[in-house]
Amino acid sequence: LHVYDAKDEYFEALKGKYEPEEKRQIIGDKFLEIQRRVAKELNLNPDEWLLGQGTIYPDTVESGGTKNAHKIKTHHNRVPEIEEMIKAGKIIEPIKELYKDEVRMVGRKLGLPDKMIDRHPFPGPGLAVRCLCLENTDGEFKTHEVPGFTAHQLPVKSVGVQGDERTYRHPLVLEGDHDWATLRDLSPKLTNSSKEINRVLFMVAGGPIESVSVTPGYLTKERITTLQEADKLVMNALEEIDKEKLVWQCPTVLLPLSINSEGQESIVLRPISSTNVMTANFTELNWQKIQELGQEILKIPGVSAVFYDITNKPPGTIEWE
């Protein structure tokens, strides 16, 4: 097994990049560049070796690679150069026609351990698509009228899906009394009634919101370290909070937004339940334990607030970018 550490090359390639689709394209191209270089260093003849990928069917659909699908986002294993290699017979993808639940069925047939089969999926581009980047404010911080709640539209955007098409809109954050039944009913009503929003969040810690400011930033080691610390807290907490294994995946997202302060950032928890990942529902976890987790995350230097993503798929994709 040969492992190549390419993090410095990726940080350099992504320096100053903010747009989600551009980030994904750069990551896919860099992946191929490094693969070819390392193969050459190992004296591997490209005419005798194939590139193996763990591509699954949703990757192809969301990249617009099926007959009737529009592109939602480019997966790193579906950049144009990869498509050319597929046509040339240079790539092998043994599970490309399977959904994620079917991949797990194959894993069980092979006798793989449950801990390996049931672990949360992790995106090919890594935390790069969970670390949102902004140079300037993207839209305005403004209030929406939502009976029973304080509702603020945040000056940042995330990727979503409507039908087979991509959306790129704002999240709306709610503050008020927590009740899962109310939020379950309210969230889709809010996204369906506004062309400005494609996600709904609920405040966990750091509120009430009085001001929001953008903390300009792209992908840096420091920001990724902050996100890794938060993600570790979340994954460890889920061992206790989600003993029933309701959560299929829980991305932890870093937003370049400072709540009631300057120069800080915010964390979003995105636990979802799904079978095939083409659709998903946000997971309704024990709220008291989520609030306790939120307070622990606030102890991370530079984190000003914690939100809980209460958006289904559609209209919100599982990953924010």
What positions do the PLM features span?
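ATP/NTP-dependent adenylation/nucleotidyl-transfer catalytic domains that generate, transfer
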Residues: 1-321
